[in-house]
Amino acid sequence: MRKHESLYLAFWVVRIREFRTKMNLSQEKLAEKLHVNTRNYQKLERGVHKPSAITIIPFLYLLSDQEIISFTRSFGQMVEKAHSQEVA
């Protein structure tokens, strides 16, 4: 997974911001739901900090089952595409 760490970080930044916007949540409110302080959430959203399992699990809990499937499939497809470009 280390090989795709930068891809994951970029993916996370886009997805968490999309989710926050879609749900009409402030950074403060989403930080509260993820059990992190606002400053750390802001760093997560900018890609300064990598999300930990302690952050990802509460985030997944906020998603519907279908959104979780979409989230994981999208990441898998992105990794597969990056891998196929490396091989080519």
Predicted regions and their residues:
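The alpha-helix within a helix-turn-helix
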Residues: 20, 31, 60
